[in-house]
């Protein structure tokens, strides 16, 4: 018997380059774990906090530097934290860690970063020297802090939806258990 006749009906064709598996860094990055709105918000948080940090770094002199230094620390920290959370969501590391812990960490990190970034932007507004780089940094800082807070509100809404869904499942189960068996 010829091998072609035995294996022909069960083997698949070579998928070729169009359908082939992803290679390189693309094989390790998967954006589907976050809904589209959350992906957009995470991308905006990352880019806006980086832009705020870059604009702040362009400032060459200041009279009241405390607000500038605090804003520098917060904008850099916000960029690094949002990059870290995005890396965790998009890489295989997400499957190695408990997903509830990742979501809980993201929830509290996003809330804390948004509040502190908003505070840093308010402080920087009161101490800046009105240069164009400072104004740009302040604008990016406020927008970034609002993106963090909007992401927090989105996560809060998702949590409430999940808890209401679980509550309705529990009540239907309880009703089914209290019905008489011979009815």
Swiss-Prot record:
InterPro entries (alphabetical): Marvel (IPR008253), MARVEL-CKLF_proteins (IPR050578)
Gene Ontology process terms (BP): endocytic recycling; protein transport; regulation of protein stability
Phosphoserine found at: 8
Sequence positions bearing Phosphothreonine: 171
Keyword Oxidoreductase tagged: no
Keyword Transmembrane helix: yes
Topology relative to the membrane: Multi-pass membrane protein
Segments crossing the lipid bilayer: 40-60, 68-88, 107-127, 135-155
Residue ranges of domain MARVEL in the record: 33-160
Cellular compartments annotated: Cell membrane; Early endosome membrane; Recycling endosome membrane
Stretches of the chain found on the membrane's Extracellular side: 61-67, 128-134
Cellular component GO terms held in the UniProt record: early endosome membrane; plasma membrane; recycling endosome membrane
Residues covered by region (Disordered): 1-20
Residue ranges annotated as Cytoplasmic topological domain: 1-39, 89-106, 156-183
Pfam families per record: MARVEL
Residues the record lists as N-acetylmethionine modifications: 1
Annotated keywords: Acetylation, Cell membrane, Endosome, Membrane, Phosphoprotein, Transmembrane, Transmembrane helix, Transport
Subunit record text: Interacts with PD-L1/CD274 (via transmembrane domain); the interaction is direct. Interacts with CMTM4. Interacts with CD58, ARG1, ENO1 and TMPO.
Known function: Master regulator of recycling and plasma membrane expression of PD-L1/CD274, an immune inhibitory ligand critical for immune tolerance to self and antitumor immunity. Associates with both constitutive and IFNG-induced PD-L1/CD274 at recycling endosomes, where it protects PD-L1/CD274 from being targeted for lysosomal degradation, likely by preventing its ubiquitination. May stabilize PD-L1/CD274 expression on antigen presenting cells and potentiates inhibitory signaling by PDCD1/CD279, its receptor on T-cells, ultimately triggering T-cell anergy.
Family per record: Belongs to the chemokine-like factor family.
PANTHER family linked to this entry: CKLF-LIKE MARVEL TRANSMEMBRANE DOMAIN-CONTAINING PROTEIN 6 (PTHR22776:SF25), MARVEL-CONTAINING POTENTIAL LIPID RAFT-ASSOCIATED PROTEIN (PTHR22776)
Name assigned to this protein: CKLF-like MARVEL transmembrane domain-containing protein 6
This protein's encoding gene: CMTM6
